[in-house]
């Protein structure tokens, strides 16, 4: 008998869509931290346990979410960044599609505690693997705390493709390093399995971030770059000839504050240094 074409149930559709956003724990951390950045936070604390599978906690001092908007924030395509299609041409935020929270809460237990500066109290709200709870008032500081637990517990097929906890934690550590480097004006405090990994000051000095994430020897072996021509600004740091590696793990490129992998730019940088490091 032929299989009939049918419309997927919302539950199945949400789990499939979640895989596009919440591919692995590092994807979840990325979405939550970018939300914190978009909220205007200048202090972000990220804590993970068991490679982010057991726990991901992201706390920020951003503007928070008004209590009446919290349940809406977990709906698909719910965003404060867009109103019309024309707005797509003027996006300056890290995210805008309104898919992250709905996708994450479909495959995890998600807890939010948030408060705006204008509110007398905050709000506490839980979505447990797609099942919404009730919003309650809570005493808390301004900003938002997002807690994600038991990631992919209801999607065994997705869990099967994850690597061991230490490897997943490594992916998150790489991500946090790039985020800290891309936003030196934000203080990042990163904790893994109860142990502090690094904490940046948020003073805007990229060299200070490098010192915290790569160490003193690395920080002493870089020099600043600041160049502007034809409306294009290039800034950052490059390593001195004695600071060379056999791969691109320490080569990090950002365009308008976003991390990218671009073989053309990478190749140009390598060619420029070829004679210096040989």
Range-by-range predicted roles:
Residues 2-278:
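N-terminal phosphate-binding caps/lids of nucleotide- and nucleic-acid-binding domains
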